[in-house]
């Protein structure tokens, strides 16, 4: 029983395969006959219309498969496209009943007439025409030609907002030799097909609208139609933010810190020059990938502004260092500088001398209080205090002479002791004078150093605010 079922199944399979081979043989036979009949007297050199005054319509459809490269410096877009062209050939029609119902065949595209549709704004020396793939020929003469092509087109790149820029690249297709009265071109859809697009790592595609244009050129009076596909691109800016923008922001915030370095360290100017060199390197990196146009990119403007701030900070640092190292030969601090810088600005910026309390300058307040009290005393009381102090000094001088034996001794001993007293007095006066001069010199230098320190702190905060505001403005401009 099982053996009989197996024989029946084998017979059915053999019969079906035989019928399939017979059908394929019949199709191949009729296709060959159709091919011979169609191309017996056919010429692909002439426009396939029965009436030469009739316009041949060509429908164009573009499918964007991949963006291979966007060369901003040379302003060239390299794209991988699938190009579909559909037109009607009046000489390639047949009756399906005469060829066993055969309604379409596939033949090499170079055997039939093809519209000379080219990319008007191509930017390479090599041919960017579609590949010679087969065409699908239908019984009513409708020809469909699908072919891939790698195109290089010129694209005007606007780098004003780089790396947050949007670009619009046009792909303009049209007939090179036929005017609009001979071959008219239409777009199959309102936009290019993006269903098979492979996502690009650098660019986002936001659309590809298509528009038909009819243009009359100066060379010819006839109209020339074309179809322009506008590729809307938005740059993925993460790479440039991480590698170009964030390092620049961090480096720019280092520039104000040069004012915080002690002047005696000798590294203030070196830090500014080092930061300036780093910014120059980043500026050169941006210049290498940008086209040589008059539009300065947004990040380039940020670099230039930052470099200007760093240059200004370095120049001001040199000025402050000159103030810091004012020595004994320098003039005293002017009165206005004492009031504005040492009295008010130092308190606002929390700049104090070494050993002086930053929170509660107690001794300074006591000294100011005593000065105010003495200034309020009457003139008579001040005169009495001075006379009392003078009499006290004379009394102490008399006691010192008695202790040294200048009085109450014989004349020879008194003269000897008085000479020693005079020498001792002169030495003490000399030492006191030296100490006073040294203190005055140190006080003058300390005042200039404090002036320099206050100016340093003032410029540090000013430059911090400027860098912060500039960064916010750049980000807001990008948005």
From Swiss-Prot:
The terms under GO molecular function for this entry are: acetylcholine-gated monoatomic cation-selective channel activity; calcium channel activity; excitatory extracellular ligand-gated monoatomic ion channel activity; serotonin-gated monoatomic cation channel activity; transmitter-gated monoatomic ion channel activity involved in regulation of postsynaptic membrane potential
Look up and give the membrane topology term: Multi-pass membrane protein
Annotated control of activity: Activated by a myriad of ligands such as acetylcholine. AChR activity is inhibited by the antagonist alpha-conotoxins RgIA and GeXXA, small disulfide-constrained peptides from cone snails.
One of the GO BP terms on file: regulation of membrane potential
Tissue expression, per UniProt?
A: Expressed in cochlea, keratinocytes, pituitary gland, B-cells and T-cells.
Cellular compartments annotated: Synaptic cell membrane; Cell membrane
UniProt cross-references to Pfam families, sorted A to Z: Neur_chan_LBD (PF02931), Neur_chan_memb (PF02932)
The chain's Extracellular topological domains, given as residue ranges, are: 23-238
* SUPFAM superfamilies noted in UniProt: Neurotransmitter-gated ion-channel transmembrane pore, Nicotinic receptor ligand binding domain-like
Cellular component aspect of the GO annotation: acetylcholine-gated channel complex; cholinergic synapse; neuron projection; plasma membrane; postsynaptic specialization membrane; synapse; transmembrane transporter complex
Post-translational modification comment from the UniProt entry? N-glycosylated.
**Additional note from the record:** The heterooligomeric receptor composed of CHRNA9 and CHRNA10 has an atypical pharmacological profile, binding several non-nicotinic ligands including strychnine (a glycine receptor antagonist) and atropine (a muscarinic acetylcholine receptor antagonist).
Name this protein carries in UniProt? Neuronal acetylcholine receptor subunit alpha-9
Source organism of this protein record: Homo sapiens
Lineage, opening ranks: Eukaryota, Metazoa, Chordata, Craniata, Vertebrata
